[in-house]
Amino acid sequence: MSKLKDNPDNSLNDRLNREKAIELARVQIEKDFGKGSLIKMGESPVGKGIESISSGSILLDEAIGVGGYPRGRIIEIFGPESSGKTTLTLQAIAEVQKNGGIAAFIDAEHALDPAYAKALGVNIDELWISQPDTGEQALEIAEYLIRSGGVDLIVVDSVAALTPQAEIDGEMGDSQIGLQARLMSKALRKITGILSKSNTCIMFINQLRMKIGVMFGNPETTTGGNALKFYSSLRLEVRKIDQVTGSSADDIVGNKIRIKVVKNKVAPPFRKVELVIYFGKGISREASILDASVKYNLIQKTGSWYSMGDDKLGQGREHAVSYLVKEKEVTDELESKLRKIIFEDPNQDFLEVGTT
């Protein structure tokens, strides 16, 4: 090696010889496996940044790190019951449709409420929906949709409801250990390879279970084995932390939730964000923009008053949010400024940093 370093001509010749050898190998690889089987990373879509789907909240988009849910990836959203998991996915569907995209909802729980989806901005006339009978059926439908290349977002609700065919055919008391975990492992191995080529984003909603006999550490775990944890590029933990009251203490108008990015392969992980989900309305876009604007000093908060320059928006958070709801042009302008500040900062590096 030292001789090669001492002689630049030898080093250059060695480099050229190795490049010729790689080129011959590339030709053979493309002959056997098809064009594009081996390319330099700078020539591939992987090396050109990560496309994303907005979550509907600029605060959550910031926490994820790439402006929303990454395309061509597997995403897991998990948490306790009634914490807002389905609401997050429906808002993502609404954002996809708003931008002219196509979304599909695989309703394994058979519990999707069309009225609620419509209230969150989902165009139910354009939403593709499937209510499969078995887990195998659900995951095969997802695979077909991904292979089609025509769907931007697929939501599977939920992993816990993906019941294997053998379990359905068996008796109620039969022991079926590991069936669902094997089903998920096999399906995800197939799905992962084709996702990036189709640029489809697939979101799995998952539930929490308690591990029996755990004395130390967190006894909570998600259903469906470990495969989804490994294959997911993004895992979001959603928890309800408080209730939001209206005009009186008995008037509960929504829930305050905390979302933690527990795994992230497209940006730094472990970020947290708190959002408000209003009953029948979902996550308030205006409330997220207000909080982000205060954070980046586009809106000033003095005591309980919110102001923007010389203009007062209102006293108290709810009045300031109401102002932004009415003044759509102001809200759009604030969002545009925030996205430039957060996502177009040249100092931010969104290369893959996570590990499996």
Curated annotation (Swiss-Prot):
Assigned protein family: Belongs to the RecA family.
Keywords annotated in UniProt: ATP-binding, Cytoplasm, DNA damage, DNA recombination, DNA repair, DNA-binding, Nucleotide-binding, SOS response
Organism: Borrelia hermsii (strain HS1 / DAH)
Subcellular localization, as worded in the UniProt entry: Cytoplasm
A GO cellular component entry from the record: cytosol
Stated role: Can catalyze the hydrolysis of ATP in the presence of single-stranded DNA, the ATP-dependent uptake of single-stranded DNA by duplex DNA, and the ATP-dependent hybridization of homologous single-stranded DNAs. It interacts with LexA causing its activation and leading to its autocatalytic cleavage.
Pfam families, per the entry: RecA (PF00154), RecA_C (PF21096)
Record-linked InterPro entries: AAA+_ATPase, DNA_recomb/repair_RecA, DNA_recomb/repair_RecA_CS, P-loop_NTPase, RecA-like_C, RecA-like_N, RecA_ATP-bd, RecA_C_sf
Origin: domain of life: Bacteria
Record carries keyword Coiled coil: no
Entry binding sites for ATP: 79-86
NCBIfam families tied to this protein: tigrfam_recA
PROSITE patterns, per the entry: RECA_1, RECA_2, RECA_3
Any one of the GO BP annotations: DNA repair
The protein's name: Protein RecA
Molecular function GO terms recorded: ATP binding; ATP hydrolysis activity; ATP-dependent DNA damage sensor activity; damaged DNA binding; single-stranded DNA binding
DNA-binding keyword on record: yes
